Each structure stands twice: as structure tokens, then as C-alpha cells.
Regions:
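Blade-loop segments of beta-propeller domains
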Residues: 58-76
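Asp-box/WD-like beta-propeller blade repeats and closely related beta-sheet repeat scaffolds
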Residues: 104-115
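Helix-turn-helix repeat elements of alpha-solenoid scaffolds
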Residues: 2-5, 52-59, 103
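Inter-repeat boundary and helix-capping residues of tandem alpha-helical solenoids
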Residues: 16, 20-23, 54, 75-78, ...
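Aromatic-lined substrate-binding rim segments of carbohydrate-active enzymes
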Residues: 42-62
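Terminal, non-catalytic domain-edge segments
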Residues: 1-16, 25, 29-44, 48, ...
């Protein structure tokens, strides 16, 4: 299944039918497709109008905003939803969504309004959250802590002897890419690494892409859409 086929599949499904675990891949896939169409307007014939894609991103942002405010959501999942909602704002500029995301972010990293930033987890999603906080507030400490997480990840890879799940590696790739784009550090071999991950994606998930597992479908959608945009 290529990007066009997968795009048709996910676009035919109402946003509310996707499980929370599928929203991040779905959002990033649509952001990449939006960027593709913005650069190449004639591809609206393939992917629909920029407005249509924009509306899907808005709907995903609405789901994320609800999840962020749901007390039953675990802390690590909430961190991921906050990071995604702030990234959605970069395409769909709704200040209400940004306010929800920033309030929730600082409620986690600066509880009770403390001056010191604390990190309850050091996940790729936390790295993206910190990058967005730096982008929107200019708080240097957020950039420093995001950099520390990226460096720790490099050390962890060097010392790791056990293979980690592919989904986790993709989440780290996304975090590293976002860090490089926002903080502006030296770029790594991003396209090469992405293509290597794409090959592994299809080895592991290719046989399940036509299944009803929407989390798998949106992961592959994210991967294919980013590849297509990176090769423009």
C-alpha cells in the first residue's frame, strides 16, 4: 500500500473513531501532507484542498485538547498529547488550543507555579514538549533540558544491547527531528535514518496495514507522508 492508498483509507474514517494511541501518527501524517500540498498545489487533485486537510488537523487538535483535560489519562500519555497539540498549532493557529497546551505543559514541568522546571519523565514526547515551550515562550531552560534528553538518548543507544520496539525508535526519530528544527542544532543524517526506519516499518507492519489496527495504519501513514515531504 502506497501513501495515496493509505491516505484514502485514513481520510475515510471519522476522527472520533481513532483511538488516542493513533492520533499522534495521524496528526503528523496530515501535517506532512499539508506541507506537500502547500509546496505543490497541483497535488490537491490527489490529497484534497489545503482547507480540507486543515480541517482534519483542526479535528485532531480538538480530540487532543479533550484528552489533555481528561484526568484519567496517564501522565506520559498526557505529555504526548500536549506535545502534539502544540505542534498542531504550528499549522492550525487557534490560540485557545495553544493556551490549553501551554497551561497543561507548565502544570507538569512547573507544578504550583515553581520557578524551577522539573521533568517527571524523559521521554521523546517530553523532549518535543520542551522544544515547543521554548519556541512559544523563549524559555532557555526548556531548550537546555530538551538538549539533555537528546544527549542521553545518544548515550543510551551506544550502550544498549537489547533491540527496542520500532514504534519507540520512530518516536525518538520524531523528537530528534523536532529538536533540530526548533533549537537549531547541527543536523544528523535524517533522511538516511528515516529511510532505514521505513524499510523496517514495512517488514514489521506491512502485512497488517490492511487490518483494523488504526494505530499501525497511522504510524505507517506518518512514516510515508514524512518520507514524501522530505524528498520534495
Amino acid at each position: 500500500m502506497n501513501l495515496n492508498d493509505l491516505y484514502k483509507k485514513v481520510s475515510a474514517i471519522p476522527i472520533g473513531d481513532f483511538p488516542p494511541s493513533a492520533l499522534s501518527g495521524l496528526l503528523h501524517g496530515y501535517i506532512s501532507v499539508y506541507s506537500i500540498v502547500r509546496v505543490n498545489p497541483w497535488l490537491e487533485d490527489v490529497y484534497g484542498s489545503q482547507w480540507d486537510i486543515h480541517e482534519r488537523i483542526r479535528e485532531i487538535a480538538g480530540e487532543l485538547a479533550d484528552l489533555i483535560q481528561d484526568p484519567s489519562v496517564t501522565l506520559e500519555d498526557r505529555v504526548g498529547h500536549i506535545a502534539d497539540l502544540m505542534e498542531a498549532y504550528l499549522t492550525y493557529s487557534d490560540m485557545d488550543f495553544l493556551d490549553i497546551a501551554l497551561d497543561a505543559a507548565y502544570g507538569i514541568i512547573s507544578p504550583e507555579g515553581r520557578d524551577e522546571i522539573v521533568l517527571p519523565c524523559r521521554t521523546p514526547e517530553m523532549c518535543r514538549l520542551l522544544c515547543s515551550c521554548y519556541y512559544f515562550t523563549g524559555e532557555e531552560r526548556c531548550a537546555e533540558l530538551a538538549g539533555e534528553i537528546i544527549k542521553e538518548r545518544g548515550t543510551e543507544i551506544f550502550n544498549k544491547s537489547v533491540e527496542e520496539p520500532l514504534e519507540n525508535r520512530w518516536n525518538w526519530y520524531r523528537a530528534e527531528e523536532f529538536y533540530e528544527n526548533i533549537i537549531g542544532e547541527e543536523k544528523h543524517e535524517k533522511v538516511k535514518n528515516m529511510l532505514m526506519l521505513e524499510e523496517e516499518f514495512w517488514k514489521q507492519f506491512g502485512k497488517d496495514i490492511d487490518s483494523k489496527d488504526l494505530t499501525v495504519s497511522t504510524l505507517c501513514f506518518d512514516n510515508l507522508a514524512l518520507k514524501e515531504y522530505s524528498l520534495i
